[in-house]
């Protein structure tokens, strides 16, 4: 009887999570289907598969790329995402290592400041940030990398600190005795050990920065630079006129890279979070 109850509960749980999964996947599938339809049929038949009379091939994708300069936006998005993630990983991991190994009032205050920054709402500083970015000429792809570093430093330092605490100090002392400088000790000894947390932080920040709309919209000089999220928003014409086919295609082009990236790396997120939080 207990075995039958367990089997029934297991089937019920599987059914519930399958339905929830379909609910989350359905909007993406609808966008994908409509990206291959002619514009006139997207509003008329949004939930049907593209057939012979509604099929538009790759025309919507070509329109999004040629007419709305989507490739340029993708290029700037890749540059900002990759540059930001690399700077975040290097700077925050070194900061966490210094905070953990050097026990002073300054490092304690720095750690508390990083933790405090995690609970400050973005809405509290966004208008001031936009003004400061314009005045200091940080309204470029290079400048926004520095701004992203400031915003995510708290969480990244917190995760790295938790992992560094689990690394035996004797390993670093042995490297120093062998003649390594502190900097070489970090890059040759500590950094390889911290790989799980590097991967975890890298994945989380890549997904956030790639999909971010509000911060680039407030900071960047939009006459020169647009990320893919902003470019899609600009595809809306005057008086509410929208090329739905091109927008559907642009959404698919925007979401495919991050889905592939996440699915190929998702197992490392749990490893990194567990290593950075539980061990600490």
What are these regions (language model features)?
Residues 1-280:
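A hydrophobic, multi-pass inner-membrane permease signature
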């Amino acid at each position: 009887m207990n075995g039958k109850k367990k089997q029934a509960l297991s089937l019920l749980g599987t059914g519930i999570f399958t339905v929830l999964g379909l609910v989350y996947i359905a909007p993406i599938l609808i966008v994908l289907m409509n990206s291959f339809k002619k514009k006139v049929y997207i509003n008329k038949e949004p939930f049907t598969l593209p057939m012979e009379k509604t099929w538009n091939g790759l025309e919507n994708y070509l329109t999004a790329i040629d007419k709305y300069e989507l490739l340029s936006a993708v290029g700037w998005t890749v540059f900002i995402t990759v540059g930001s993630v690399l700077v975040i990983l290097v700077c925050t991991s070194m900061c966490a290592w210094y905070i953990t190994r050097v026990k002073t009032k300054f490092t304690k205050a720095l750690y508390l400041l990083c933790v405090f920054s995690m609970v400050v709402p973005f809405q509290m500083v966004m208008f001031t940030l936009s003004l400061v970015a314009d005045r200091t000429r940080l309204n470029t792809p290079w400048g926004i990398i520095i701004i992203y570093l400031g915003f995510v430093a708290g969480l990244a330092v917190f995760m790295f600190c938790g992992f560094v605490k689990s690394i035996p100090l004797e390993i670093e002392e042995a490297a120093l005795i062998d003649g390594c400088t502190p900097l070489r000790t970090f890059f040759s000894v500590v950094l390889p050990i911290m790989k799980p947390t590097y991967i975890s932080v890298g994945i989380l920040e890549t997904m956030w920065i790639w999909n971010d709309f509000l911060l680039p919209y407030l900071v960047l000089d939009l006459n020169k630079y647009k990320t893919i999220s902003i470019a899609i928003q600009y595809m809306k014409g005057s008086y509410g006129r929208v090329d739905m086919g091109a927008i559907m295609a642009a959404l698919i082009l925007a979401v495919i890279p991050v889905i592939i990236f996440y699915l190929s790396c998702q197992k490392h997120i749990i490893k990194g979070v567990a290593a950075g939080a539980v061990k600490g």
